Amino acid sequence: MKRILLALLRIYKIALSPYLGSRCRFWPTCSDYAREAVIQHGAARGSWMAACRLCRCHPFTQGGYDPVPGVETETAQTGKFAHPAAGHGPVTVRLPRP
């Protein structure tokens, strides 16, 4: 599924994007954001992140620099830790109180 989404994004960048012009208010562009989100977070979560980004990209927003949040950023904020090569999702770690 991940490969299919990446292929569709590439087709969009090559075939459609040049004709539509540059309209994205963010950097990286929404299509680049979608590509990075799918690569870093997988097909399902990456697609959801890309859809949320597209909803934020409208004429009434200021735009600017909006990178894809990395796995290490999310884990530090949520307290959930997972190695990318692990065959499971994030695991909540509860540390004993001192």
Curated annotation (Swiss-Prot):
What GO CC terms are in its UniProt record?
plasma membrane
Membrane topology summary: Peripheral membrane protein
Under InterPro entries, the record lists: Membr_insert_effic_factor_YidD
Q: Where in the cell is it found?
A: Cell inner membrane
Q: Which residues form the signal peptide?
A: none
Keywords, A to Z, come to: Cell inner membrane, Cell membrane, Membrane
Presence of keyword Transferase: no
SMART domains registered for this protein in UniProt: Haemolytic
What is this protein for, i.e. what is its function?
Answer: Could be involved in insertion of integral membrane proteins into the membrane.
* Name of the molecule in the record: Putative membrane protein insertion efficiency factor
User: What organism is the protein native to?
Assistant: Cupriavidus pinatubonensis (strain JMP 134 / LMG 1197) (Cupriavidus necator (strain JMP 134))
